[in-house]
Each structure stands twice: as C-alpha cells, then as structure tokens.
C-alpha cells in the first residue's frame, strides 16, 4: 500500500510518499507564487501536481492535515477550496481520502498531542527520515531550507499508517 501525506498550503504544500511498512518513497513540497498566479491558478497547480503524484506512484490513500482556523477566516476559506480540489482529484481517481488533525497525528505518532512541531520533526528525524533541521523559513544566504511542511506531511502519513495498523511492527 502506498500512502501520500499532504500538509496543504497555497504557498508550500508539503508531501511525502510512504509504503505501509514506512519505507519512504519520496518527499518534497509544491510551491506556488502569489505574485505570479491567482488563487485559483495556484489551487489548480497544486491539484494537478497531487494528481500526478497519485497516478505515477499508484497511491492507495491520500491523508491530509485537517486544519482549524480560529483567527483567519480568509485563510480557512482558501484552504477549504484547496482541500475541495484535492478531494475532487481523489474521487476522480477512486483513491481513498482521509483527514487527521495535527493534534491527532501528534498523539498517535508520539503519544503527546501537545508536542510542538519541532519536537514532532525531531521524533521523525530520529525514527524515520532526516530531511534536515526543522525550519519554518527558507534562508538562502545560510543554505537553510524550509522543512516544516514536509515534516508536517510525514507526521500525518505516519500517524495514519500507525492508527490503521498497516505496519506489522506497530502490532508487536
């Protein structure tokens, strides 16, 4: 089984592909630019890239972060549009679509639903894959890459895999 984990964002959607045995097949981010593209163009770009990832890698399930927006209704509306486009792609390709909240993912994966993002990234680095230090910002002058979106996507896919007991090592 191949699982595609997504941390949805218009500017930088983090993604990863893992097998049910937690073998990492790939990870990256899909970046769009608000100065070059409209909101709808950006949604279209991301949805098409996700569609290609699903088709090329024979993905069985897509798991995305279910986000809550207490403070910014506009961001919530935009991400809801993006989520709708991804759900449409999954339905069109007959691929299972699932959601986990960040708190659920942290609790399932590490046992601590309140663990901060950098703590979850450290857990993933130590137990699964090291894609570099956790960073919310890209600083080209210091060669620091933004890894937060990718680590967040790993938290979602690994937690969903663990929750569904798809990896036999979880059952030991």
Predicted regions and their residues:
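Phosphate- and other anionic-substrate recognition elements at nucleic-acid/protein interfaces
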Residues: 1-172
